[in-house]
Amino acid sequence: MSGNSIGQNFVVTTFGESHGVALGCIIDGCPPGLELTEADMQHDLDRRRPGTSRYTTARREPDEVRILSGVFEGKTTGTSIGLLIENTDQRSQDYSNIKDLFRPGHADYTYQQKYGMRDYRGGGRSSARETAMRVAAGAVAKKYLKQVHGIEIYGFMSQLGPICAQTIDLDQIEQNAFFFPDASKLEALDEYMRELKKSGDSIGAKISVIATGVPVGLGEPVFDRLDADIAHALMGINAVKGVEIGDGFGVVTQKGSEGRDLMSPQGFESNHAGGVLGGISSGQPIIAHIALKPTSSISVPGQSMTAQGEMAEVVTKGRHDPCVGIRAVPIAEAMLAIVLMDHLLRHRAQNQDVRSHTPVLGMR
């Protein structure tokens, strides 16, 4: 109905607004017996949390998650897991000047037209603040996937504006505020963001997310293909305007002889498909990329209109991210984890007794 849930066997439902009392989510379908505490989720929440860098919004939220249900004596019970994060640093007065004004590039106009009203404070339900609960739920999925099945998920910023990562050093990702894997570009990123902030403008970014250890067989053709559900989940992240699986749009210029991921008993020779063939995981790493648009909440004046249809000028005040991609890495990881968790449980429900005599291939 209202689009607040994702998944079939591992179901995540979120609620709450940017300037409301709290954010929350319900997780249905988590298997019992998983050791789980708030600390298991807090690490990823801290990675997403606002106010941790001079290049993100100045809004300071501790984002401390509370487990309300579904955990007893430190383990999941198999019943619904209730999670809550209180909002503590709302400054709704920053938005009083746009109560009847539509910000171009935002959901103000479409929410008003769809619902006949809108919560103008920080974007309400359309704010990326809602993704805190996705990250919390994703952390539960990530722990189960790693602990029970050896599946690991990690993401990084592969491009910010014109600056692209030339090398991928996974050890660098958590060592800088950009989640950037190329240390040689950090100085350029820092300078670029300083100048951008001075100008009052914003910039887009590209985020890459990878899952390793994914078994063969996840995905439910034809309408619940694994790559289709991954794309659906990643496109549901605020500001995402494009998703690629594997080589993505790069396949347009590839020849069939170049992009077909040759096989031998020793394994696959390449992974242009991004770990999915025919909508089913191949056992290779799942590789996806997302493109995030620059936020429209900028201090550069722009033309818009009021709710009454009158012309108006917009100069956005408040605390905003000059590049929303900086905090998107843990969100992308969470969405991939939720999809993989859901498909793992679905596959187990239908196919746990299937035995194939064909060798399982890895990368050569």
Swiss-Prot record:
Any one GO molecular function term: chorismate synthase activity
UniProt entry tagged with the keyword Transcription = no
Name the pathway. Metabolic intermediate biosynthesis; chorismate biosynthesis; chorismate from D-erythrose 4-phosphate and phosphoenolpyruvate: step 7/7
Keywords, comma-separated and alphabetical: Amino-acid biosynthesis, Aromatic amino acid biosynthesis, FAD, Flavoprotein, FMN, Lyase, NADP
Free-text cofactor note: Reduced FMN (FMNH(2)).
Q: Which residues bind FMN?
A: R125, S126, S127, N238, A239, G278, K293, P294, T295, S296, S297, R319
Record's catalysed reaction(s): 5-O-(1-carboxyvinyl)-3-phosphoshikimate = chorismate + phosphate
Does Lyase show up as a keyword for this record?
yes
Co-factor(s): FMNH2
Positions contributing to NADP(+) binding:
R48, R54
Q: Specify where the region named Disordered lies, as residue ranges.
A: 41-60
Q: Which GO terms describe its biological process?
A: amino acid biosynthetic process; aromatic amino acid family biosynthetic process; chorismate biosynthetic process
Q: Which Pfam families match?
A: Chorismate_synt (PF01264)
GO cellular component, alphabetical, reads: cytosol
Documented EC number(s): 4.2.3.5
| InterPro entries per UniProt | Chorismate_synth, Chorismate_synth_AroC_sf, Chorismate_synthase_CS
Q: What does this protein do?
A: This reaction introduces a second double bond into the aromatic ring system.
Q: Which family does it belong to?
A: Belongs to the chorismate synthase family.
Q: How does it assemble?
A: Homotetramer.
Q: Protein name, please?
A: Chorismate synthase
Taxonomic lineage per UniProt? Bacteria, Pseudomonadati, Pseudomonadota, Gammaproteobacteria, Alteromonadales
